[in-house]
């Protein structure tokens, strides 16, 4: 794929971005001193950006952005834009509809060929077809709640059976570990069948992980780039026609009347994002929407149309972990056309997925007051603010379709993986590192 257009070529991270340059010049003109992004890092960096020690990592991240999905997202060829290739028929059984399905009832399986150009998939929900499935998907949240509802012979048995108590959790979780020896005793799963552990929560919100038996699962499916089946919450792809107007709501700058918006569904005063909000709101007005905390109900026009009226959106994750970049960035901010202010993994991690100039990171500022001053500066300087939208000329946003896309991607992975045996020895050690 051709590299991104020249305007998206990113500067060294030991140099200030043009937006920060303009801000610094404006402050100097007013004859006032103001801390700018990277203020505390000048001596190490020789400028206003990040330390030289991370420059090589930044270069990798920027190259990944220029080549869009084909380096970091090697497992994610474009979905609706590539021609399907004939593949062997693969059956994938979804053991539980995640969170018991939307509205409390399971949906019909998607057509992978029609939706994602992935052919040769037989998506199953009937557990009677367990023996015919090449892969079985287990959603972690449902897995820990349904201890009795596992596939045979690992499912429910009499707890009084002292010869072998079949459970998948250890004593810390109130049950007994299902060991490799026990697996041999009761029988094995169908030859070549893969058990796939699926999870899209952060390690901080993944209970019961330490209790899972070792070597029980063959593959992982998550937002982590080192998963066996990697499916992020979203990604960017190159526009076929750079002159084409961005789809969706887009920036629509003339309609933006508010400054900062935040939609939050889980309010916890102990979370870093809530603490940072309290600090930020002392210096700049933040309109909070949601049913918890100080939030007010989202207007009837809907979340995206509401956020589209604001210049900035707080894409604050509930916890900070590697690759944990959720719909708060991809959907709530990018799709609505607001500039995201992110709190999550570090900047280098974000730059593996999106251009440097597409977002503002809280870590670029010594404190919330400095960030607030920068947002107010951008509010007064429209030309500088518009620079945060330049990436849209070359890239468009793909939003992952939960849970259909994960289902179809698992099928695709089975088709292309061959028959190499593999098992995950310790999920907790991998996911929580």
From Swiss-Prot:
Question: How does the protein associate with the membrane?
Answer: Single-pass type II membrane protein
Transmembrane spans: 53-74
Residue intervals on the Cytoplasmic side = 1-52
Q: What happens when the gene is disrupted?
A: Mice are born at the expected Mendelian rate. No visible phenotype; likely due to the redundancy with FUT7. Simultaneous knockdown of FUT4 and FUT7 results in leukocytosis characterized by an 18.4 fold increase in blood neutrophils and significant increases in blood monocytes, eosinophils, and lymphocytes numbers.
| Any one Pfam family match given in the protein's UniProt record, by short name | Glyco_tran_10_N
In the Enzyme Commission scheme, what number(s) does this protein have?
2.4.1.152
Indicate where this protein resides in the cell: Golgi apparatus, Golgi stack membrane
Molecular functions (GO terms): 4-galactosyl-N-acetylglucosaminide 3-alpha-L-fucosyltransferase activity; alpha-(1->3)-fucosyltransferase activity
Q: What class of enzyme is it?
A: transferase
Q: What does this protein do?
A: Catalyzes alpha(1->3) linkage of fucosyl moiety transferred from GDP-beta-L-fucose to N-acetyl glucosamine (GlcNAc) within type 2 lactosamine (LacNAc, Gal-beta(1->4)GlcNAc) glycan attached to N- or O-linked glycoproteins. Robustly fucosylates nonsialylated distal LacNAc unit of the polylactosamine chain to form Lewis X antigen (CD15), a glycan determinant known to mediate important cellular functions in development and immunity.
This protein's name: Alpha-(1,3)-fucosyltransferase 4
Q: Which organism was this protein described from? A: Mus musculus (Mouse)
Q: Which gene encodes it?
A: Fut4
């Amino acid at each position: 794929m051709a590299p991104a257009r020249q305007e998206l070529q990113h500067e060294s991270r030991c140099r200030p971005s043009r937006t920060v340059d303009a801000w610094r010049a404006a402050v100097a003109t007013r004859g006032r001193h103001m801390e700018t992004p990277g203020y505390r890092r000048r001596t190490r960096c020789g400028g206003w950006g990040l330390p030289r020690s991370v420059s090589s990592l930044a270069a990798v991240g920027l190259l990944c952005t220029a080549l869009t999905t084909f380096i970091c997202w090697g497992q994610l060829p474009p979905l609706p834009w590539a021609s399907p290739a004939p593949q062997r028929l693969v059956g994938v059984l979804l053991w539980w509809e995640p969170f018991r399905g939307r509205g409390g009832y399971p949906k019909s399986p998607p057509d992978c060929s029609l939706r994602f150009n992935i052919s040769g998939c037989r998506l199953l929900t009937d557990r009677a077809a367990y023996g015919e499935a090449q892969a079985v998907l287990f959603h972690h949240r449902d897995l820990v709640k349904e201890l009795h509802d596992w596939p045979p012979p690992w499912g429910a048995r009499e707890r009084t059976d002292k010869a072998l108590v079949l459970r998948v959790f250890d004593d810390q979780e109130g049950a007994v570990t299902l060991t490799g020896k026990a697996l041999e005793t009761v029988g094995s799963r169908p030859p070549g069948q893969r058990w796939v552990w699926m999870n899209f929560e952060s390690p901080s919100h993944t209970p019961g992980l330490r209790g899972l038996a070792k070597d029980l699962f063959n593959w992982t499916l998550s937002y982590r780039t080192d998963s066996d089946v990697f499916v992020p919450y979203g990604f960017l792809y190159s526009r076929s026609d750079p002159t084409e107007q961005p789809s969706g709501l887009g920036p629509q700058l003339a309609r933006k009347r508010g400054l900062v918006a935040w939609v939050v569904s889980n309010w916890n005063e102990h979370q870093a994002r809530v603490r940072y909000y309290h600090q930020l709101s002392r210096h700049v007005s933040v309109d909070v929407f949601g049913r918890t905390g100080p939030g007010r109900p989202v207007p009837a026009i809907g979340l995206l149309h509401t956020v589209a009226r604001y210049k900035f959106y707080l894409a604050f994750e509930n916890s900070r972990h590697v690759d944990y970049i959720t719909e708060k960035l991809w959907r709530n901010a990018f799709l609505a056309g607001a500039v995201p202010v992110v709190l999550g993994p570090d900047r280098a991690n974000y730059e593996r997925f999106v251009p440097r100039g597409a977002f503002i990171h809280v870590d670029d500022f010594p404190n919330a007051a400095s960030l607030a001053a920068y947002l107010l500066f951008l509010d007064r300087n429209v030309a500088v603010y518009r620079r945060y939208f330049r990436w849209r000329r070359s890239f468009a946003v793909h939003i992952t379709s939960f849970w259909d896309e994960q289902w179809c991607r698992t099928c695709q992975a089975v088709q292309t993986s061959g028959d190499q045996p593999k098992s995950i020895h310790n999920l907790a050690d991998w996911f929580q590192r």
